[in-house]
Amino acid sequence: LDVMLNAIKVGVPCEDIELKWRKCIEPKGYIKKSRAGYPIGLGYPPDWGEQTYSLRPGDKTILLENMTIHVLAAIWTEDFGYEVSESVIVKEKGYEQLSSVSRQLFVK
């Protein structure tokens, strides 16, 4: 998750964020074919299919200030799955986290 979040800033193409994630997981033998993030906020123009921008290969949409994105680092296999995510606002030199919840992992 951090590798994607740290790549977010104004002027970066959406596909570049996803590429960071892919380069992180593929050497470990994992592949994720679905997007790594999607827009959030008021409305989903042009429709609920979210055909605006996504963190996926081929999406050349340039991140602009104050865009909102739900970024998710997720892997699903036949044996297990995991997902961690963060909702953020794109800023000039990075991102602003929308939640104040710690991402600390607790093991019982």
Residue ranges and their predicted role:
Residues 1-108:
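Active-site neighborhoods and metal-handling regions in enzymes and metal-associated proteins
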